[in-house]
A protein has these predicted regions:
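Stable alpha-helical structural segments in soluble proteins, enriched in small hydrophobic residues
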Residues: 82, 86-97
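Short beta-strands and strand-coil junctions in structured, solvent-facing domains, enriched
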Residues: 50-52, 72-73, 91
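Long amphipathic alpha-helical segments used for membrane anchoring, targeting, substrate engagement
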Residues: 1-38, 93-113
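Amphipathic, hydrophobic secondary-structure cores in small proteins
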Residues: 65-73, 83
Length: 113
């Protein structure tokens, strides 16, 4: 063995165990945050409230309510636009909440998910 060689990883020695524990805790926190996000329900409206949507944390539509006044057979495109707008708003809200929860779980580290 070379003189002065103590083994380990660049002198990190005892810190490696602590680093592994920290990584495992972060992994558990991330999994808990993902489960919490999946269980979320986020709502949004469009057209002054005539279209209401509720989506899950997995982006599935849970409910869609359309006020009868929004149904105009001569302007189906307007209703389609309101549904898309409501879904996009709910999805944006969900992304914001998800980013906040993941940031807390990772201690602010920007990790790809």
């Amino acid at each position: 063995m070379a003189k002065g060689f103590r083994g380990g990883f660049g002198g990190m020695g005892g810190n490696m165990g602590a680093l592994m524990q920290q990584a495992q805790k972060m992994q558990r926190d991330i999994e808990a945050a993902k489960a919490e996000i999946d269980a979320l329900e986020v709502d949004a409206t469009a057209g002054g409230g005539v279209v209401k949507i509720l989506i899950s944390g997995t982006h599935e539509i849970k409910s869609l309510e359309i006020d009868p006044s929004a149904v105009d057979p001569d302007d189906v495109e307007m209703l389609q636009d309101m549904i898309v707008a409501a879904y996009n708003e709910a999805s944006r809200k969900l992304a914001e909440i998800s980013a906040e929860k993941m940031s807390k779980a990772t201690g602010g580290a920007q990790l790809p998910f």
